[in-house]
Amino acid sequence: MLSERRLEVLRAIVQDYVGTEEPVGSKALTERHRLGVSPATVRNDMAALEDEGYIAQPHTSAGPIPTDKGYRLFVDRLADVKPMTAPERRAIHHFLDQAVDLDDVVARTVRLLAHVTRQVAVVQYPSLTRSTVRHVELLSMAPARLMLVLITDTGRVEQRMIDCPAPFGESSVADLRARLNSQVAGRRFADVPQLVQDLPESFESEDRPTVSTVLSTLLETLVEETEERLMIGGTANLTRFGHDFPLTIRPVLEALEEQVVLLKLLGEAKDSAMTVRIGHENAHEGLSSTSVVSVGYGSGREAVAKLGVVGPTRMDYPGTMGAVRAVARYVGQILAES
């Protein structure tokens, strides 16, 4: 186990390397930080940190830089999440509050995350499989034609036109609408099939075919919309960190083009706690020189999707973690209010 002093030396190395982009020497550390020991003592601590794999020298004549293991320890034990300032929080809320629908919320969130973190932002659309029904609207468009409108707790709206097997009167439409909402409003989508399976039997025989058609359309909508979607933005930010990648940023860019890879990354994030994957902790080889900071977001206690950022391992972890957490919280509030 590392002593407190060596932990402080590691903290200083990470902070200086992230801030200056240059390997850090013992003399510079003692000048910039109140370590309370001589450069010679710091050199001994550096040697011990290197022996244990927390830092490494890129060149024999250069100072040390943090390894993935060093960044891991920094994030787990030494990094305090940096809260956003009051003006920053107000700006975030104002920007997101202008969104007109769910697509706009996701698009604004991607732009916002990429801007405030200066990393690549990835935002997953809320999953219908983890959502709940807010309301089901049923409208008569013609004697034998209906419109089904499904509204989720995240503000997602799905519309379907239904051709009925027989005319369906306004009173029957109102009755079905009321019964549907009494059964499914506030319930998880995964529970809907079982909740409505006996509903046709409660209607008159002449209305049962139409009720069954409406229910089939509702359930088909759930199946159609379960495909996971995400949005990515700020890829150009990677060009600022070209020297942080061993050979080229091409493998990173190629990995970011694969939606399956990104969905898996976000899938590893915990619903409420921050998840930080550093370097080779990322299973995809193309992302082995990056760090991924992600967290779940939602309109209630349970997350309905994930968001996060991808950047080099030489990352401002306290600031990035604070920004990701703040944006996720505000997106959840916007969805709850929508």
Curated annotation (Swiss-Prot):
SUPFAM superfamilies named among the record's database cross-references: GAF domain-like, Winged helix' DNA-binding domain
A Gene Ontology BP annotation from the UniProt entry: negative regulation of DNA-templated transcription
Described purpose of this protein according to its UniProt entry: Negative regulator of class I heat shock genes (grpE-dnaK-dnaJ and groELS operons). Prevents heat-shock induction of these operons.
Pfam family, one: HrcA
PANTHER family, per the entry: HEAT-INDUCIBLE TRANSCRIPTION REPRESSOR HRCA
Organism: Streptomyces albus G
Protein name: Heat-inducible transcription repressor HrcA
Gene name of the record: hrcA
InterPro entries in the cross-refs: GAF-like_dom_sf (IPR029016), HrcA (IPR002571), HrcA_C (IPR021153), WH-like_DNA-bd_sf (IPR036388), WH_DNA-bd_sf (IPR036390), WHTH_transcript_rep_HrcA_IDD (IPR023120)
HAMAP family linked: HrcA (MF_00081)
Family under the similarity heading: Belongs to the HrcA family.
Keyword Transcription assigned: yes
Record keywords, A-Z: Repressor, Stress response, Transcription, Transcription regulation
UniProt xrefs under NCBIfam families: hrcA (TIGR00331)
